[in-house]
Amino acid sequence: MSHSVKIYDTCIGCTQCVRACPLDVLEMVPWDGCKAGQIASSPRTEDCVGCKRCETACPTDFLSIRVYLGDETTRSMGLAY
């Protein structure tokens, strides 16, 4: 089953999500949008098992990273009924 990982611009570059991911789906890449100068990226979403440990580890008030599991992706986009 395919999962979608979305990184929002509220990411503060803390690396908590990257360290929490047991399958190294995430990595940090350079970004000028925060003090840390980096943002999480999800180049290997095909390896995501949907454990959502990255979401749990995110310290921002608005989760900067979200994992949408299979059909949940289309529901969240209003494409499923």
UniProtKB/Swiss-Prot annotation:
- Report residues binding [4Fe-4S] cluster 1: C11, C14, C17, C58
Q: What topology does the record note for this protein and the membrane?
A: Peripheral membrane protein
Q: How, per the record, is the cofactor bound?
A: Binds 2 [4Fe-4S] clusters. Cluster 2 is most probably the spectroscopically characterized electron acceptor FA and cluster 1 is most probably FB.
State which Enzyme Commission number(s) the record gives.
1.97.1.12
- Where does the 4Fe-4S ferredoxin-type domain start and stop, copy by copy? 2-31, 37-68
Q: Binding of [4Fe-4S] cluster 2: at which residues?
A: C21, C48, C51, C54
Q: Which UniProt keywords apply?
A: 4Fe-4S, Electron transport, Iron, Iron-sulfur, Membrane, Metal-binding, Oxidoreductase, Photosynthesis, Photosystem I, Repeat, Thylakoid, Transport
Report the subcellular localization: Cellular thylakoid membrane
Q: What is this protein called?
A: Photosystem I iron-sulfur center
Q: Which residues form a coiled coil?
A: none
Per the record, the GO terms for biological process are:
photosynthetic electron transport in photosystem I
State the SUPFAM superfamilies in the record.
4Fe-4S ferredoxins
Q: Which GO terms describe its cellular component?
A: photosystem I; plasma membrane-derived thylakoid membrane
What do we know about how this protein assembles, alone or with others? The cyanobacterial PSI reaction center is composed of one copy each of PsaA,B,C,D,E,F,I,J,K,L,M and X, and forms trimeric complexes.
Its annotated function is as follows: Apoprotein for the two 4Fe-4S centers FA and FB of photosystem I (PSI); essential for photochemical activity. FB is the terminal electron acceptor of PSI, donating electrons to ferredoxin. The C-terminus interacts with PsaA/B/D and helps assemble the protein into the PSI complex. Required for binding of PsaD and PsaE to PSI. PSI is a plastocyanin/cytochrome c6-ferredoxin oxidoreductase, converting photonic excitation into a charge separation, which transfers an electron from the donor P700 chlorophyll pair to the spectroscopically characterized acceptors A0, A1, FX, FA and FB in turn.
EC top class named in words: oxidoreductase
In its UniProt entry, the species of origin is given as: Synechococcus sp. (strain RCC307)
Q: Please give one Gene Ontology molecular function term for this protein.
A: metal ion binding
Catalytic activity annotated for this protein? Answer: reduced [plastocyanin] + hnu + oxidized [2Fe-2S]-[ferredoxin] = oxidized [plastocyanin] + reduced [2Fe-2S]-[ferredoxin]
Please name the InterPro entries in this protein's record: 4Fe4S_Fe-S-bd, 4Fe4S_Fe_S_CS, PSI_iron-sulfur_center, PSI_PsaC
Q: What PROSITE patterns is this protein classified in?
A: 4FE4S_FER_1, 4FE4S_FER_2
Q: Which cofactor does it need?
A: [4Fe-4S] cluster
